[in-house]
């Protein structure tokens, strides 16, 4: 990953006063501290002792043996927390997780969209034995639990005895340290589940102090019905519920965020439901061809035509990966139809037919990037005080969100557009995110808390990742500390791996 020259130069100057990546006590001097609470920033010295923040004060006298770092002109923030990450796909093979650390992420919540490692006890043990550069917390995947009980026959509602076994498995996973239940109700493994099934499982997560995070059942024409379902789950299961990667993903709903969403938060408050959400700062998404036809009639021409139209049209849906013919990656469905000499509908049906084996084999034969959200709605979600930030990204995925989400918010939406203040953005990346998950010792800069920190230049921070180069590192993220150790220094990964497998403490409510 080639870093821009300006970043390397600034980073080199920044590091001159301390040994790179040293696991030593550190004094950060005269930083602009944005402490994660949402309050005004202030200039201060911050002392790190071991893996904890020891002192925060206007001026601190250096101690013998302490590494000094001049942070004048730079922002010091808590480490960024990604509340919806798919970086667990590949984390065991890539322990440095550079696409995450280089954008300031110190903690990520994985096991999303209904898909989690199983059993979590064993997965956590592997992380304990060979730590990564990031902290990892996990949800329990609804589809994962369904698959353990129903096997390949999960394309139907569950039976009472199956639901009972799912509840037992979920309880065991929560006891192993999971932070809640996730679902991907728009995907094959879960779309056949009833709302009552999800409620009964959410009750188990809630009883253990967990949360429910949902890729809702429809993000297109029926998105508000899907939000209604989520509110019902929260109301009846009595636990916090979170709309993940919230979007209004079809042209007929564009512009409705400001009109419709306040009523949902108000309704939730009246009904005693703790409603939350998270968002990534892009108008395009990354998923599968099959998600375009939400009732799964993949070979019904009328349904396919509607699915294409509801997602911005075939010209806005691009193959990111296509195993049967890799040369098609990067082409839109419109372009593929022209190559094949068929209609866009026929091209879609052929693409799905040639990758249907993925459903049985569990492989990843295809993926798409679709542009179907409006910038107006994305900006509204980004600015809303109850909506945290997520990448929904992978370590090495086709969507630039995996490498650019957090710098993009700071550069594009804070500095360039003024959609929200720096303090508000950092709060949503840190303190708010920690409170949503239930992390009590991270997400803020205060004495006694874990020293997960990000040092960045507010005048230059920006994302550089694109669809063409989805892993391009950002500009302006100069240093990242995890548990008192530098995992990024001078804009470069250090190779240190102090990350923890985070388990939910028993009885701690989010």
Which role fits each region the language model picked out?
Residues 33-45, 363-373, 378, 420-426, ...:
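Acidic, glycine-enriched loop/beta-strand segments at the rims
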Residues 15-19, 136:
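N-terminal signal peptide c-region/cleavage motif recognized by signal peptidases
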Residues 80-90, 212-218:
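Histidine-centered catalytic micro-motifs
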Residues 74-76, 80-85, 93-183, 202, ...:
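Divalent-metal coordination cores built from histidine and acidic residues
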Residues 299-301, 310, 371, 379-386, ...:
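C-terminal cap of metal-dependent C-N hydrolases
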Residues 24, 33-79:
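Histidine-rich, glycine-flanked metal-binding segment
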Residues 172-229:
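Divalent metal-binding pocket/active-site signature
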């Amino acid at each position: 990953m080639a870093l821009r020259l300006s970043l390397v130069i600034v980073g080199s100057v920044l590091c001159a006063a301390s040994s790179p990546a040293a696991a030593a006590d550190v004094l950060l001097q005269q930083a602009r501290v944005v402490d994660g609470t949402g309050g005004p920033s202030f200039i201060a010295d911050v002392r790190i002792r071991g893996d904890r923040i020891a002192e925060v004060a206007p001026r601190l006298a250096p101690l013998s043996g302490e590494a000094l770092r001049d942070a004048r002109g730079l922002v010091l923030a808590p480490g960024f927390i990604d509340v919806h990450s798919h970086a667990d796909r590949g984390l065991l093979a890539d322990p440095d997780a550079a696409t995450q650390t280089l954008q300031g992420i110190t903690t990520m919540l994985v096991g999303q969209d209904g898909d989690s490692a199983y059993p979590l006890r064993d997965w956590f043990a592997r992380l304990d034995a060979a730590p990564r550069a990031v902290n990892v917390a996990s949800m329990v995947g609804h589809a994962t639990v369904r698959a353990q009980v129903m096997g390949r026959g999960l394309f139907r509602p569950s039976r009472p005895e199956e639901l009972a076994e799912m509840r037992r498995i979920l309880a065991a996973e929560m006891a192993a340290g999971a932070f809640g239940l996730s679902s991907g109700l728009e995907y094959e493994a879960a779309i056949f589940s009833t709302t009552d099934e999800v409620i009964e499982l959410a009750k188990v997560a809630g009883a253990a102090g967990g949360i429910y995070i949902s890729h809702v059942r429809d993000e297109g024409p029926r998105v508000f019905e899907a939000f209604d379902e989520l509110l019902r789950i929260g109301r009846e299961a009595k636990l916090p519920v979170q709309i993940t990667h919230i979007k209004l993903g079809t042209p007929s709903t564009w512009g409705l965020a400001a009109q419709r969403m306040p009523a949902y938060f108000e309704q939730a408050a009246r009904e005693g439901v703790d409603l939350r959400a998270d968002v990534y700062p892009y108008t395009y998404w990354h998923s599968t061809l099959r998600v375009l036809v939400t009732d799964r009639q993949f070979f019904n021409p009328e349904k396919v035509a509607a699915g294409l139209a509801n997602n911005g049209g075939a010209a806005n849906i691009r193959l990111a990966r296509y195993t049967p013919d890799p040369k098609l990656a990067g082409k839109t469905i419109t372009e593929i139809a022209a190559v094949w000499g068929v209609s866009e509908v026929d091209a879609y049906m052929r693409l799905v037919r040639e990758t249907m084996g993925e459903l049985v084999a569990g492989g990843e034969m295809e993926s798409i990037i679709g542009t179907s959200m409006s910038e107006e709605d994305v900006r509204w979600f980004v600015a809303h005080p109850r909506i945290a930030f997520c990448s929904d990204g992978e370590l090495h995925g086709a969507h630039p969100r995996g490498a650019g989400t957090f710098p993009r918010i700071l550069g594009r939406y804070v500095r360039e557009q003024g959609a929200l203040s720096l303090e508000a953005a950092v709060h949503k990346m840190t303190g708010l995110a920690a409170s949503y998950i239930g992390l009590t010792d991270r997400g803020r800069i205060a004495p006694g808390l874990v020293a997960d920190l990000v040092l960045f230049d507010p005048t230059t921070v920006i994302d550089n990742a694109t669809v063409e180069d989805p892993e391009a590192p950002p500009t302006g993220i100069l240093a990242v500390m995890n548990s008192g150790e530098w995992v990024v220094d001078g804009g470069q990964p250090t190779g240190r791996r102090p990350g923890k497998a985070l388990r939910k403490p028993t009885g701690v409510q989010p």
